[in-house]
Amino acid sequence: MLFRHLVLIISTLMVANTAWSANLPPREKFKRPDSIPAPLSNPLTLEKATLGKTLFFDQRLSRSGGMACATCHSPDQRWSDGRTLPLQAESVSNARRTPTVLNSAWLSALMWDGRATTLEEQAVLPITTAHEMNFDLASLVSRLQRIEGYRPLFTQAFGDDSISQQRITQALASFQRTLVSNIAPFDRWVAGDEQAISESAKRGFAVFNDKNKANCVACHSSWRFTDDSFHDIGLPSKDLGRGAKVPSQVTLMQHAFKTPSLRDLSIDGPYMHDGSIRGLKTVIKHYKSEAIQRESLSKDMQKFELSNLEESDLIAFIQSLDGGALKIQAPMMPE
């Protein structure tokens, strides 16, 4: 009798396991790429990336000389700043959380509202924004031209020591393209290592992809877990996001923001474009039932129910996307 009971339990577990496994998409959809993309107008080279790294960490790119790109995009904070709102942005209307620059080589739209389409274009924005680095590019070029130590770096990167706005942005973009997430346990599982992630994470992957459950994959797709598109997810914010950059009649873009990647998230946030949510449980709670209902709300924002186990499994899966901090030592500053 005991034997038959054990057989029944094992059979039930096998059927359940087969059921959720059958719903999984092919792992290949989430396989990491083998190379880093770069535009033909700015081929990726070690020399340009090395120059870009120095510029990225140099506080002299700001008017005050006290803020670098790395101030808000720190290696110690998953290439963000760990803050709800950026430094000096507390008084800014509709301030937005600092996004990570990890895996930005693959982005087709940058900034939360997609106002930049290339890393080269984006590199200008924080330098010239008043509540960020608050500089002008002509003055920056003049400042760097007076720093003798930069001349050999520009020569190695571009063939001569001429310093220009274009070369500065190309170098910064090149360095950012080299910032790629470390291999995560999920990546090893995708590659065939069945022991790389827990059974809980595997079940969470099923919940993540199940249209009748969380259906996170509707927006968080591809190996970076983003569709690179814009969605209104029903946050109580007056910020129009992408809607302020397109004609007002484009209703779906009102309150819409770029889908962030789920790779290498910090343990407790802050999350969302405005840093308004901390903790993955609170994020799940929002998606389950707390989105503000309005005309622009994404069609993928459908209420759903999860058991406590399914929530825990979903969080375990998201945590399996963490490859650990991409540590880079700050370079010596040229004089």
UniProtKB/Swiss-Prot annotation:
One Gene Ontology term of the molecular function aspect: heme binding
Gene3D superfamilies on file: Cytochrome c-like domain (1.10.760.10)
Organism superkingdom: Bacteria
PROSITE patterns named among the record's database cross-references: CYTC, MULTIHEME_CYTC
Subcellular localization, as worded in the UniProt entry: Periplasm
InterPro entries: Cyt_c-like_dom, Cyt_c-like_dom_sf, Cytochrome_c_Peroxidase/MauG, Di-haem_cyt_c_peroxidsae, MauG/Cytc_peroxidase, Methylamine_utilis_MauG
GO biological processes: methylamine metabolic process
Protein name, per record: Methylamine utilization protein MauG
Source organism phylogeny: Bacteria, Pseudomonadati, Pseudomonadota, Betaproteobacteria, Nitrosomonadales
Gene: mauG
